[in-house]
Amino acid sequence: MIARLRDRLADRNRLPRPINAAIDWVAAHPMSIPGRLAALRYGRPQSGTPVTAFAPADRRVLIAPVNYSGQGRAWAAALEATNPSISARNMAVEVPGGFAFAADLIVPVAVYQNDRDWQRRQFEAVATSATHVLVEAQEPPFGRLWGRRTDTQVAALVARGVDVAFMAHGTDVRLPSRHIARSRWSHYADPSVYVPRLEQLARHNRALLDRAGRPVFVSTPDLLADVGEAQWCPVVVDPQRWANPSQVGARAAGPLRVAHAPSVAS
């Protein structure tokens, strides 16, 4: 019965409108009483989680907090490989049941959401050590610190002299209504996709970027349709991971084979 209820809740389009509205409201107000109660589902944090540390360097860059498709770590490695005067680190929240990618600092979701001590220590470590921070997907790098407001956390870093920019990844800023209008193949048109919350999230994040007034990067060029002022930062692909020695020198039969593992499965 519990499994059936979980499946029913997972298919948001099958829920009554008032229930969907209530779920969306809690998601949009994480520091409300229902939002605080919802955060308890992440569990009790264990103490002693480390914070970000950099190697000695002229410029010290943190990329956080989602590491979608391992790109946060890949970008950090690319920065260090390009310029020896840069120490780059990434931090990612570990979500049970989600995709697992290597990161310099992996923080359990219970710590990220509910450990005020870690949130404060991480902020202080970054504010005193980093020269640059790249905030991924407009998610708050320090969990629920200061009301879980990304703009407040960014402003606090800027006030401490840290240069902050944003990295938009996809659903965080891609407006479903616009995407459906311009592409008949839009995945947002799939009946299994719950569009209202995604539309709300994209509009919220677009407004956040406007308020913050910081530089913005996008990981795929199609996002320039939603964030026209952004700069494209290409994703990093390690060809060695995809190499197939058995096919070297052999003529491939049939069409090109491509593996696709989305960061968020619908």
Residue ranges of each PLM-predicted region?
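Short, flexible/disordered intra-domain loops and linkers
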Residues: 106-111, 140-150, 180-185, 191-192
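N-terminal pre-catalytic "stem/leader" segment of glycosyltransferase-like enzymes
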Residues: 14-140, 159, 172-179
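Conserved donor-binding/catalytic core segment of Leloir-type glycosyltransferases
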Residues: 61, 244-266
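Membrane-proximal helix-turn-helix segments that form the acceptor-binding/catalytic region
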Residues: 154-156, 184-215
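Helix-loop-beta element that forms the nucleotide-linked donor phosphate-binding surface
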Residues: 206-240
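A structural signal for short, well-ordered beta-strand segments and their strand-loop junctions
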Residues: 87-92, 133-135, 162-168, 216-220, ...
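Well-ordered, non-membrane alpha-helical segments in soluble/globular domains
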Residues: 113-120, 145-155, 197-206
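Short, flexible helix-coil linker/hinge segments at the edges of structured domains or between repeats
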Residues: 178-197, 228-253
